[in-house]
Amino acid sequence: MPEETFEFTASRWTRGNLLFPVRIEVSRERVARIKPRLVGANEESIPISKVASVNITTGLIWAEIRIDSSGGSNPILSHGHRKADARRIRDLIEGFQTGR
């Protein structure tokens, strides 16, 4: 049975996302930030069980999301997401952590 993955793409109208917008992927197992490049991609991920907090900072239109791990490693940072998408990312992570 394939794992269900939710994907959220940052707006191309925000800094650093014009050609290759950042994607946040959330699944039952992990949350990942994927930054495509001309050749390949840069991916960082945190297991859902190790997510300590999700912080959302909203602006007029866009939101920035910060996902901290309980292991003390570098947080996942992403900007340029719609506010509704940022809240959905937080709700999915919290839901997967509680088993919903």
Can you say where each PLM-predicted feature lies in the sequence?
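Acidic, Ser/Thr- and proline-rich intrinsically disordered linker/docking segments
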Residues: M1-L18, V26, A32-R33, G40-R100
